[in-house]
Amino acid sequence: MNTQTIDATIQRFNAIRWHDSKLVGLCFYRAEGEERVKISLEMLGEGGALTPAEMIFEASTYVALDVDLEGKRVCSDDISSAECYASSEWTKSLSEKSPYDSFEGYLHFRLYLIPPGGTINVLAKDFSLEMGAPG
């Protein structure tokens, strides 16, 4: 993945309107020879309408979850924000623990739930967002 593609992916992810959208599901699966992480969402649109959506993290290699399910429920499954990074403390930590694994071309996708909901971290090469998908 070249720098231009990485930058475009980061910008595309960070441009999504995350605040007060809802995290309603999480799934791990394998397709086309790669690991994938799917999150089912209800994306908040103009006028407060919620639209079902699915986000697929493609070519995923690591996931770290710190989710308080009761806190998530109490806060109506709301997402606070989300960000994508080319490099982060988490990716540096993974590299130190696994010096023989190459994480070149991987991006750190992080979703923050409304406190005390927690965080979801995914190390993947790309993502796709399908609006109107069943949740």
Where are the predicted features?
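Surface-exposed, interaction-prone regions used to assemble/regulate multi-protein complexes
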Residues: 1-135
